């Protein structure tokens, strides 16, 4: 975060920093790959993401899945995206470029189904097929994103752009116009609704208000959501937000369980409940700002 990338690489290095086979090796190799991408060293990035994938696979086989599952998915995405960039630079008309794009599509398909990264993988694979001139497969990716699993839980507004681009390149102007109309219908009402919400916070309300409104929009009826529900669920699916929200819900349920048991009424229970309440009261406003 301080942009000291060389220092970071020193700590993440397989020999001088985080050794292979350690519990942090998958994350270390993955972060090193991100730095290589930042430095525009795509060949090295590809190698590091492949190392991260191997380390994450070994961790999963050993039963260490708490973090390795996500690193596995992110490493697969990293490999797919690097291949896409390499293929785009070389051009799909060259054998090397076409091969890189085909490898990109292959790795996007490796992202496990029904995970938080599945939708992104399908969408980005659609652009790979477009680059390869496989317009039917590209439109198939867009069609997949209209399934209820995706349409009800996260917004994919960019899929309309991909769809229109496919039609445009095939001179299907009427379908371009129809798709644009569908986009405006789907998202045209969301923008003013979102703008109205952003200006509706009561003056006396604290930052926690934003968090409360988001939670209500995610879980309540779509017609009553003050934030367009698909947008609210997109925000709530953010990895950092989801982890903090899970922690907050756990604090609330644990505190309720403690208060419900007569055995936990002594001084220690009081101190524990006070600590839980203080942690929750500090985190909720932060969640609103986040």
State what each model feature region is.
Residues 30, 35, 46, 66-86, ...:
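Beta-propeller domains
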Residues 2, 12-26, 54-71, 110-119, ...:
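Short solvent-exposed coil/turn linkers within tandem alpha-helical repeat scaffolds
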